[in-house]
Amino acid sequence: MLLIPAIDLKDGECVRLRQGLMDDATVFSGDIVAMAERWVNQGARRLHMVDLNGAFEGKPVNGDAVYQVREAFPDLPIQIGGGIRDLETIEAYLKAGVSYCIIGTKAVHNPEFVAEACKAFPGHIMVGLDAKEGMVAINGWAEVTDHNVIDLGKQFENDGVEAIIYTDIGRDGMMQGVNIQATQALAKALNIPIIASGGITNLDDIRALATIEKDGVSGAITGRAIYEGSLNFKEGQALSDELSKA
């Protein structure tokens, strides 16, 4: 199972939000490339980058920071989300060498767009599904919809998405541990990989996720825990690799 460090971008800086609130951001670094280097040096094999301004404005705002990381680490796969609402944006990111584009809110508002994107860029599209008590939330978590997360996940699987990034939003950025049951239920219902996000705080969470890797959980995104120190990234990835072999 891949442990994937998150670099959330706001106004050109690396930050973490609590519960998706733009005015509740902790700034961790103004040097994005140095932050990426820190995780690469600790053994990261992929980066998860989110353009937070882009997510709220509906178009890329921090693309330059993504491109700088891409240039500094040409062999490192990057997955990017936030503000991806049209095929042109996806094309620009992929041409720059980004590996995966993550469609979030637009996937729920306009599911046809996911099918279009998968057709145009097969193998490069992921969907980010945020859910609270099994129901999908959108618009920076401001709105909980009446869409069931498993039903939508199946639809996107049929469209050809590469993976689903699943966040239990009751827990993200709050250091409460992972919602194993909800993550497992989604993974078991689908055949494509699930990347767990939200609530990973320590090595125990990695141990818990490792028990459902066989159900289709291929990765876990970690943010606040590695920035605030409750999880050592290098130890976390080493443990994950060890448990994957077991």
From Swiss-Prot:
One of its GO terms (molecular function) is 1-(5-phosphoribosyl)-5-[(5-phosphoribosylamino)methylideneamino]imidazole-4-carboxamide isomerase activity. GO terms for biological process: L-histidine biosynthetic process; L-tryptophan biosynthetic process; malate metabolic process. Pathway: Amino-acid biosynthesis; L-histidine biosynthesis; L-histidine from 5-phospho-alpha-D-ribose 1-diphosphate: step 4/9. The keyword Cell cycle does not apply. It comes from the Bacteria. The keyword Amino-acid biosynthesis applies. Its EC number is 5.3.1.16. One of its GO terms (cellular component) is cytoplasm. Belongs to the HisA/HisF family. This is 1-(5-phosphoribosyl)-5-[(5-phosphoribosylamino)methylideneamino] imidazole-4-carboxamide isomerase.
